[in-house]
Each structure stands twice: as structure tokens, then as C-alpha cells.
């Protein structure tokens, strides 16, 4: 098959389908899509990232999002001086949980998988990173139950402040 659509196109296609299914006026499409561009971090995130940076941790984003969207979000939230790298699946043309995605930081920094603390609020992301060999941490802000997957995270935290206690 070897077909690939970027995250923005997949999101747009999914939104089109949902809008039709729920009879939402198509004129709202761009307004809804643009909500992705104004996402803000949770209150503690910037403070914790700055503390990690002060401790000389390499900080990165590994996302299915497009580079342009990710860079826009980082810049609009004044985080561009905090992150060392933004890794987008667009570099390898395949979505997580393919191992090529998780290989990107390993290859760039020439580190072992276990040296990466991989955080996500998404259980599928946590499982993918953990099965790859990362030290996965589930950010469970809402006291949810972990999906029935073949992996359980090494750690579970309620917010990023708790991360400072476990690394």
C-alpha cells in the first residue's frame, strides 16, 4: 500500500466525516480545525519543563502532528526555548506505534531506549512507547482506567509535577 497522509489531512478528513454524520454546518470546519492551533499546556507544564531543562535533561516532542503545527504550538506557548527537538512522524512517513518513529530520538542522540522517559496522556501512545523499550509514563489527569492493552506503564502520574519525584 505505502500510502501516507499527514496528520492535518487525516484530521480534516475525519472532521468532514463527523460533521456530515452529526449534521454540523460545513462552514464551521475551518473554525474547528483552527482550535488545534490554539491549544494551551496545563498550568504546571511550563514550570516543570523549565525545571527539567535546568537539570540538563534533553526535552523533546515525538508526535504524529505535522512539523508546522507542532512548531506553531510550541512557539505560541513560548516553549520554543525549552524543547531541544520536535520529532514528527512526517520525517519517516509512518504513524506511531511503528518503531521507525521511536527510533528517531535514539538515532539522533545515540542513546539507549531505556534512557528515554516517554510521557503521554494517551494509553495507546504509552503502550507503543513502552513496547518499543522506552520508560513510559502515563499522565492520567482524570483518574481513568488504562485501556486493555498488552502493556502497563512503568509509572502513572496525575500531573507533570509528579514527574519531578520519579526521575
Describe each PLM feature range.
Residues 50, 62, 66-67, 71-167:
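Asp-based, Mg2+/Mn2+-dependent phosphohydrolase catalytic module
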Residues 30-38:
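Surface-exposed cleft-lining segments at the edges of enzyme active sites
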Amino acid at each position: 500500500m505505502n500510502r501516507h497522509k499527514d496528520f492535518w489531512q487525516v484530521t480534516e478528513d475525519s472532521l468532514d466525516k463527523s460533521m456530515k454524520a452529526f449534521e454540523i454546518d460545513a462552514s464551521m470546519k475551518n473554525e474547528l480545525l483552527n482550535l488545534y492551533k490554539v491549544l494551551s499546556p496545563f498550568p504546571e507544564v511550563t514550570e516543570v519543563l523549565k525545571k527539567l531543562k535546568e537539570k540538563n535533561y534533553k526535552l523533546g516532542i515525538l508526535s504524529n502532528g505535522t512539523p508546522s503545527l507542532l512548531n506553531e504550538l510550541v512557539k505560541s506557548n513560548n516553549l520554543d526555548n525549552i524543547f531541544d527537538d520536535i520529532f514528527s512522524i512526517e520525517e519517516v512517513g509512518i504513524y506511531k506505534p511503528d518503531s521507525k518513529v521511536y527510533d528517531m530520538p535514539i538515532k539522533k542522540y545515540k542513546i539507549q531506549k531505556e534512557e528515554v522517559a516517554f510521557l503521554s496522556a494517551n494509553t495507546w501512545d504509552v503502550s507503543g512507547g513502552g513496547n518499543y523499550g522506552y520508560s513510559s509514563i502515563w499522565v492520567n489527569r482524570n483518574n481513568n482506567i488504562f485501556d486493555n492493552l498488552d502493556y502497563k506503564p512503568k509509572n502513572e502520574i496525575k500531573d507533570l509535577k509528579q514527574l519531578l519525584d520519579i526521575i
